[in-house]
Regions:
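Active-site anion/phosphate-binding pocket segments in diverse small-molecule metabolic enzymes
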Residues: 1-189
Length: 189
């Protein structure tokens, strides 16, 4: 056999002797550890991916208003709601409906109602000065806070591999080097 490879991400980290001619880096390509069991002091991994968007609409509603399909969330007070243009068709897990969160202006905003095909809503009542086009962090850093892939995937009843592989073709890939945007790649137009 001219080329041998048996090492996946975990064995690259923990099993030196199995590297052979090639390795299959998999999840460590994203800067993520393959499991909690691997030695984290061997490779200092940093997440290579963030998932960000922006607010497209804001509306204030009174107490008792149903939000999203089938009114799966009903407001219990006057609430300011922001619409986020990402949904399960983009790979954002529907299982985060009414239980996930995002970061806006360095603060957590809870997801309210269902994750729809193309959008979902968050409660931004307590985020001062929030406005349309504000950046929304679904995974990554915002100020001194962070939502990790592992956190989001765990909340969705999943794991990091499934989350990163599930991000759909509709989501443009923006490549950044040294803080500067280098290229944007669109798979669907």
């Amino acid at each position: 056999i001219p080329i041998k490879h048996v090492s996946n991400s975990a064995s690259i980290i923990d099993l030196d002797g199995f590297r052979k001619d090639m390795v299959r880096s998999g999840i460590i390509t994203y800067g993520l550890y393959p499991s909690e069991e691997v030695s984290k002091d061997v490779l200092d991994l940093r997440p290579a991916m963030e998932l960000k968007t922006h607010i497209v609409y804001i509306k204030e509603v009174e107490a008792g208003e149903g939000i999203s399909y089938n009114h799966t969330y009903v407001t219990d007070k006057k609430t300011k709601i922001a619409t986020i243009p990402v949904g399960y068709a983009d790979g954002y897990p529907r299982s985060l409906s009414s239980k996930g969160k995002v970061l806006i202006r360095g603060q957590y905003a809870p997801i309210i109602g269902r994750i729809c095909m193309d959008q979902f809503m968050v409660d931004v009542t307590d985020i001062e000065g929030v406005s349309v086009m504000d950046e929304v962090t679904l995974v990554g850093h915002d100020g001194n806070k962070m939502l990790t892939v592992e956190e989001v995937a765990n909340e969705a009843g999943s794991f990091n591999y499934e989350f990163v592989c599930g991000i759909g073709k509709r989501v443009p890939r923006v490549y950044i080097r040294n803080g500067e945007m280098k290229e944007t790649e669109y798979f669907e137009k």
